[in-house]
Amino acid sequence: MEDFVRQCFNPMIVELAEKTMKEYGEDPKIETNKFAAICTHLEVCFMYSDFHFIDERGESIIVESGDPNALLKHRFEIIEGRDRAMAWTVVNSICNTTGVDKPKFLPDLYDYKENRFTEIGVTRREIHIYYLEKANKIKSEKTHIHIFSFTGEEMATKADYTLDEESRARIKTRLFTIRQEMASRGLWDSFRQSERGEETIEERFEITGTMRRLADQSLPPNFSSLENFRAYVDGFKPNGCIEGKLSQMSKEVNARIEPFLKTTPRPLRLPDGPPCSQRSKFLLMDALKLSIEDPSHEGEGIPLYDAIKCMKTFFGWREPNIIKPHEKGINPNYLMAWKQVLAELQDIENEDKIPKTKNMKKTSQLMWALGENMAPEKVDFEDCKDIDDLKQYHSDEPELRSLASWIQSEFNKACELTDSSWIELDEIGEDVAPIEHIASMRRNYFTAEVSHCRATEYIMKGVYINTALLNASCAAMDDFQLIPMISKCRTKEGRRKTNLYGFIIKGRSHLRNDTDVVNFVSMEFSLTDPRLEPHKWEKYCVLEIGEMLLRTAIGQVSRPMFLYVRTNGTSKIKMKWGMEMRRCLLQSLQQIESMIEAESSIKEKDMTKEFFENRSETWPIGESPKGVEEGSIGKVCRTLLAKSVFNSLYSSPQLEGFSAESRKLLLIVQALRDNLEPGTFDLEGLYGAIEECLINDPWVLLNASWFNSFLTHALR
């Protein structure tokens, strides 16, 4: 917990909390939960005060950034965090200048706008009970009380919340984040119970004598005995209070808080319709590579030279023909485009010196495939605003698609190991400062688990393609440049290998804005027969271009070689993120680290070595219709990496929406599993928000299917 506090909070807050504890003779290293609670309370007090000022007219305003010379006065005086002597000096000074009554206890803030002291509370318990305790302790109507909880609730004197909604939301979000971070490290239960005392020893003792009299004296008004008060608290149902608070906020709000039970949630409704189709920018499990080992040819490292060398390793080229047409496209154009690529590559070889780049001739088939002269003419709005029936371009609603089995197969394949290494040890990047031994050890273990993973191949392939396409888009804006799709790896024996997946031909690319689109035609080699899953290849025209001899257990067999051709498009911003796909390695490493941290905090020692080297232990990987799937730590690393990579490859507004909305339902279910007795209102509205993102995206549909499996097994 101490390490978490030092990582999670601003160093100034940590220092103040340490001083406060030492002032009261407490040790932050021993009373770690108290240390965390004090830091949290300090941060909430500072956030409460941040950005709130009083202008020259005495009006309260919010200024997040602006003129530092403006005549503004801070709305709140912060008392919390000062040493006791200084804090009382500030309180006395305020009382003398404003005439307000001096409080019995040190408050947290003074509000110059409302002319009152404010007591801020942060509780891990039931908010109403904590509020009663505060009010009973202060016994002053002059001090305003404002309580926040880690579950997003708040309570204030006379329902006067002082601050605007956004400022309060910022505080609630921060508290929720702290709770999530603690939970992910296995610290939350201990922290929560340290305040609640729900499982502490005193509850099992009979309270007698002086302590009993003191307990009876310190009850809130209208309670005759401790048992009486306990019975009220245990049977307390917050429904009416919450509804009352909501109705105070707005007359339009009419919410009934319903308890969320195991039987409450229903599965997400996945759409019906034709099966969803492949929409990634390049082939994944179906890709085929033409490779050269230990490349040492002239111009090695220049993409066009490498591509020609790879093409020469294959001798099974045949006259191409269409075997799966694209339903809406002019398929002969795709066929002629491939023939043009072959012819122009042959022309290059006949030249004395091979050029570093190749711009394709602007033939009719390429102009059609790249959408040349197809974009509607742009007209300035000023020139057409007087047109009576001017309206937005009408576009049809997207057609609903159902989940298809191929996307689960793609994901499974991405988690598998290949026989090549796709990243060097330092690919994740060295720390600038002298890196701790533990951190470097974790990185090395993680890299060893994922360096041969197919998802890592997709990362390097994505980085290469996006970098090459963005470079060409800027350097050769008007040209139809031929861009080889290349990756590099090392074999098991450590030999370097260069792979060619196919080619891209880039269209015109005058990209002024981040979202301006560049069209491209992709042509990718494959051994997958598209007729096996035609729905997956809806957007492609597939040609048969040759025969490949493959070594199998029964000897050499001949298999047809296919070329998957399609028109596609991307933008500057998408290419920028594609170039940064290595971030997926970092994201999944951080997720693994939080698992190690949780384990280490339980065992109270670093568990990195045991975590990676104890091969007998299995870990939960995910949910399937069969239940919770488990696997080795390596499998967990590769699964987390594959999820991160697929989030990048299949990023879309549907995924953004589904992730944000389904997370809310996930947190409610998690609260139920933690016995926190969650309540909800308008649950069907939340389901609606999730389900409107389930349209036709294969990755989103698969995640929704996984979510349903999770609901089934989580609530048994």
UniProtKB/Swiss-Prot annotation:
UniProt motif Nuclear localization signal 1 (NLS1): location: 124-139
GO CC, one annotated term: host cell nucleus
Keywords: Cap snatching, Endonuclease, Eukaryotic host gene expression shutoff by virus, Eukaryotic host transcription shutoff by virus, Host cytoplasm, Host gene expression shutoff by virus, Host nucleus, Host-virus interaction, Hydrolase, Inhibition of host RNA polymerase II by virus, Manganese, Metal-binding, Nuclease, Phosphoprotein
Cofactor note text: Binds 2 manganese ions per subunit.
Entry-linked InterPro entries: INFV_PA, PA/PA-X, PA/PA-X_sf
Function as written in the Swiss-Prot or TrEMBL entry: Plays an essential role in viral RNA transcription and replication by forming the heterotrimeric polymerase complex together with PB1 and PB2 subunits. The complex transcribes viral mRNAs by using a unique mechanism called cap-snatching. It consists in the hijacking and cleavage of host capped pre-mRNAs. These short capped RNAs are then used as primers for viral mRNAs. The PB2 subunit is responsible for the binding of the 5' cap of cellular pre-mRNAs which are subsequently cleaved after 10-13 nucleotides by the PA subunit that carries the endonuclease activity.
Similarity-based family: Belongs to the influenza viruses PA family.
Name of the featured protein: Polymerase acidic protein
Organism, as annotated: Influenza A virus (strain A/Chicken/Hong Kong/220/1997 H5N1 genotype Gs/Gd)
